[in-house]
Amino acid sequence: AGLATSQWQALATSLINDFVYKGVSEYVAWYESALQVNAVTELLNTATQRERALVTRVEKGDLANVVLTEFKANILQQRLLLAELKQKRDAHAQMLSFYWRSPKGDMLIVDEANPPKDINWPFWVGNGQLMTLRNALRNHPELDVMKLEQQVVNNKAALASNALLPKLDLKASVARDIGSGPSNLDGTETKVGLSFSYPLGNRKAKAEQAQLQSKQRELEHKLTSTEQAITQRFEQALVYWGQARDIVALQSENAALAKTLSKVEKTRFDAGDSDMFVLNARAQNEIKAQIQEIKAKVDLLKAELTLYKEAAMLHSLNN
């Protein structure tokens, strides 16, 4: 009963770990989409204000109407992008409500349009956390379940081996002679006997023992393979996390540069030193760069989350 309880506890830990991973993954997916919607909306509002200024210039004859048409076409592309991002954001918000529940278990409505400024991310990773996560691999619930299964099989194998052993019984009996013959005996007589028996049907017992020994070898191999697989998954997640940190730095630099170039191009256009084609290209690059920067930052969160997931440490949130 104790082994069965321990097995269920290890299995429950594994299930909770997977459930938390899916829920938090859905949260960061919604968070990414919501941030991207806000970024594009802000740029689109700025572009709309600029459109009004261009309309005024066209009406005054300072600017050709075709220039305004090109600008409107660019704004339309931004609005289409915004609509797609909103669709993605709302879909993730709907999925998130399945995981986001009240203490009573009721699904909560997610305010999909207003992501928090600080999500208080609990899964950040540093050198100390990496050491803790590595140590946790030895107590992974997948391994615990298999070790407990091994223990059950080992116990059965021990019982099967004992069943094949011959049985020795030492018996002692005491008798008193109360006969009436001429040589009547007084007192008692003690007899000692040794009984040796070998269990019948030992072929069946041997077959059962061989089957259990085969199961022991199978579980040992499976345990070793699982340990290696868990370690490999963690190491892969660690490599991805390191790369994600580098990409965040590069994408942030790229976004800042794209913003500067777009601002410079607007100044050049107003001075008559640039055309609408280049201006639109700079604006599109700025939007793409901001979207990629947000994606890179959220990818880093996902990478940290994966490290905790592979170490089976997500269940600790419930403790």
Predicted segments, located by residue:
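Amphipathic alpha-helical coiled-coil scaffold segments and their short linker/junction regions
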Residues: V67-E70, S102-L170, L317-N319
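Metallo-beta-lactamase
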Residues: L85, P141, A296
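Small/polar (Gly/Ser/Thr/Ala-rich) solvent-exposed segments
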Residues: A1-L15, N154, A163-T190, S197-A210, ...
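A glycine-rich, aromatic-flanked flexible loop/lid motif
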Residues: I119-V125, L164-K167, S183-L194, I230, ...
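Periplasmic alpha-helical coiled-coil/stalk elements that build and connect Gram-negative outer-membrane
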Residues: L15-T132, Y240, A244, N285-E286, ...
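Amphipathic alpha-helical coiled-coil segments
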Residues: L15, F19-V40, Q49, H92, ...
